[in-house]
Each structure stands twice: as structure tokens, then as C-alpha cells.
Amino acid sequence: MLTYETWEENVVSFSEEDETKGALSVLNWAYEEYKDEIVYACSFGVEGMVLLHLINQVNPSAKVVFLDTNVHFQETYELIQRVRERFPSLNIIEKQPELTLDEQAKLHGEKLWESNPNLCCKIRKILPLEKSLVVEKAWISGLRREQSETRKHTKFINQDHRFQSIKVCPLIHWTWKEVWRYVYKHSLPYNPLHDVGYPSIGCEKCTLPVGDGGDSRDGRWAGKMKTECGLHYQ
């Protein structure tokens, strides 16, 4: 088994000639390699809808973890319910932070997402995922190279130094148009905020719509010199 400790570069290769640009091949390998010791960390963005559909074909009882920061958009919570109905056999786990919002405010002040967004992300996203991955050998992410400058070198299989794990990224070669083409082709549910200028959707407190021609992550932590929550350490 390929693990963080036994990491070898390019130990496995995948054909990218099929309709999914290698995504199904990657997922088949991942679930064969890690069995029940792999989890998909899903934010329920549009890429997530594609991956959930593909994962359901490969492993209908796969584990999916959603990092519930308690400050997501209502539309996101409603989408999760629709996904549960569409893919009832998937094991969707909503992981909560150790601190409630009130406890966080008492310790670090009100609106930590404004005063110290990095700490807020650590408490409400990074630490919960870290705890989830303690019992896993690998995790799946919907990163695409096209999304941002910080993601353009992502590979199918990555040695993840942030969580000392293996990070599997099946959609690295997909374009934004290809993601949406797949969603429409398979009539997949998606967050309606995508239709009103939100290409990337995170917490309600830190996500704004993006103007025409903007980077897909420009609406995340706008004005904070920050475009990543910290889950995807480079």
C-alpha cells in the first residue's frame, strides 16, 4: 500500500483518454488500494457533485466527510440533503469543530473570520479534517489545476505534508466547462449560488460573488490576501 511514509513519485500511472480524463481510473485504483481507509472530503461545490457521481459508481458505500463549520450558506445545507436523497448508499458524515461559535467567540473574540481568518479556518476546518484522517490512509479532493495558481501543479496522487497522508485528486485535468457539462448531462443537483456569481462556495462569512473574468477563488476571503483555507498545503 502506498502511504505517506512509503511515498514514491510516479509509482502508478493512469490513462487519461476516457470521458472522465482519468478520474474513474484514479478512483478505481484508490478504492482498490485503500479499501475502507480512504475518505472523500467534500465541500459540496460543483466539482463535488461530479466526484460524488463518479465515486458512487466505483464504491456506493464510500465515506464522505463534510466539514461543517456551522457558518455555511443555507443553500449548502439544503444541497447536502438533496445529495443524500440522490445517493442514499454513500456514507456522508458531517464533521463538527470542537468549539461552538459561542465558545470560539469567548476564547478569540467575536467574528474571528474577520480578525484572524487563518485561525478561524484552522479551528473550524483544518483540525476537524485532521481528526477525521487519523484513521485513514488517504483522502480524496476535488482540486483542479485550472482553479488557481496555487493548484496548477497538483497531481493525481500527492504526498500530503499538511496531514501526512496521501491525497488523491481525480479531477486535475477537468476544465470548468467540462465540470458543468458533466453536471448537466447527468442531471446532478448543485448549489444554486453557482447561478448567481459564486464559482467557489465556502463559509457564508467569507465568500462573495465574483465578477466576470475573475479568478474562480477571488470571492474567497476577499480583501484578506488569502485564497486557501489551509487544507491544501503546497
Swiss-Prot record:
Tell me the pathway.
Answer: Sulfur metabolism; hydrogen sulfide biosynthesis; sulfite from sulfate
Keyword Cytoplasm set for record:
yes
Q: Which HAMAP family match?
A: CysH
- Gene that this sequence comes from: cysH
EC number assigned by the record: 1.8.4.10
Q: Where in the cell?
A: Cytoplasm
> PANTHER family this protein is in?
PHOSPHOADENOSINE PHOSPHOSULFATE REDUCTASE
Question: Which residues catalyse the reaction?
Answer: C229 (nucleophile)
Q: Any note on cofactor binding?
A: Binds 1 [4Fe-4S] cluster per subunit.
| Reactions the enzyme catalyzes | [thioredoxin]-disulfide + sulfite + AMP + 2 H(+) = adenosine 5'-phosphosulfate + [thioredoxin]-dithiol
An annotated Gene Ontology molecular function: 4 iron, 4 sulfur cluster binding
Protein name (database record): Adenosine 5'-phosphosulfate reductase
Keywords, alphabetical: Cytoplasm, Iron, Iron-sulfur, Metal-binding, Oxidoreductase
Which family is this protein grouped under? Belongs to the PAPS reductase family. CysH subfamily.
What is the recorded function of this protein according to its Swiss-Prot or TrEMBL entry? Catalyzes the formation of sulfite from adenosine 5'-phosphosulfate (APS) using thioredoxin as an electron donor.
Cofactor(s) this protein requires: [4Fe-4S] cluster
Q: Per the UniProt entry, what species is this protein from, by scientific name?
A: Bacillus cereus (strain G9842)
**Residues where [4Fe-4S] cluster binds:** C120, C121, C203, C206
